[in-house]
Amino acid sequence: MYYRITDEVALRSWTDRGFAYYRRGMRKPLPLPAHLAKTMLRCDGEHDIETTPTVMYLVLKGLIEPCGAGEGPSSWSAYHRCDNVCFPMINLMVTGRCNFNCLHCFNAADNAALMTEWSFADLLDLLDQAQECGVTSFQLTGGEPMVHPRFLDLVREIYRRDMTVFALNTNGSHLTQEVLDELRSIGCDPEMKISFDGIGFHDWIRRRKGAEESALAAMRLCVENAFRVQANTQVNRKNVHTMMPTARLLDDIGVHAMRLIRTTEVPRWEANAPDACLGLEEYYARMLDFCRAYAASGMGMDIETWQFVGMRPQDRSFYLKPVKFASGSHHNGGYCCNCTHIMAAVTSEGEIVPCNQMSGYLLKLGISLGNLHTTSLRELLSDGAYTRIANMDAQDLAAAGHKCATCPHFSYCGGGCRALGLLFSGETTTRGLTYEDPAKCLFFEGGWYDRVREALDGWTNLSPIDA
């Protein structure tokens, strides 16, 4: 009997893990036991194999299917060994250009407008390299990604290679019915992450008259067309008082999630509004007030407050971002960041960075972990400076000998956010990435765990720790 790997499954392996497989549309590969992989490798339409219990199991799981002799798997489904560390996703900044000039842009090292942009030829080359490295999906960002002259062509090329776009970060000003129709015709159904910084303040922070109106119109249009919408909302001393009415407006529109992001001390924001940052304790206090009010509001939109509390009104549950390893799972291992070890970030200059949120600060410090215009993606995703930082684990952080090494809370927070560790370390080299995140220190040492539990009494805590 002849078998083939189904068109909905792709078999892969990487240098840092054994066999794994993707299901179509899945962002992360699933591990595959060696004995199952050994059988799947023979399911190529060329080998006449016995229908054993293992084969039947693989058929029932939808991993293989009977076929005729010579009917092998598709090029996407066929086994491919990737000679690099596994990073299944890329956060791609396709252009630094933007039709806005936001006060807080974290991609910028100063107030100069970013003008760097990937050429379409280089983007196609990057997609081919990503395919060879086992990447399956992209988040597209900018600048404003849709100002790239070949934006829709880029999306088409991603899907032509059997990869997907799972999210689009946009200011919404270029979203039209025609664009949404074209995305759907391509098969692209991303989460629309649309910036909206509070009623009456969005135009100010984006430095564009009419930005608020266009962002709200874009959200309504996306909801009407059944795209999932997340509002990304900067929160600072200027606009924090608008967060509850803003949440009510977004919930009424049908936005499925609101992410409130503390406007951070990145170079451009420090130059433009140095006194507008909420201090860390001030931020926790204002966000706890917001969460308490939101819990009583009856709204159904999911909430995430940056580095603090996430809320799921549908089942009245909440989780705590500082608690990375909850009771029963805390340990001295585990990745420092749940994102950087699965998603590489690439800037419009071609720099590879742990996350785009720290790209402007790294640029200001003159720190480069590699550039795709001079080094291949495979090389950058092999064992080296970038992968050691992106895959830094809690043991690495403890070994650095800073505060985390002896902290009683370390087994829960794992050191916290590496971008904040660098930002507040005072260091000007990558050594700063090994310092503690002071926001997490404040959370545990300042009793914020208990304060959140008390404020959300009656809601299920998904991040319990041993009190």
Residue ranges and their predicted role:
Residues 120-141, 148-279, 283:
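Radical SAM/AdoMet-radical enzyme domain recognition
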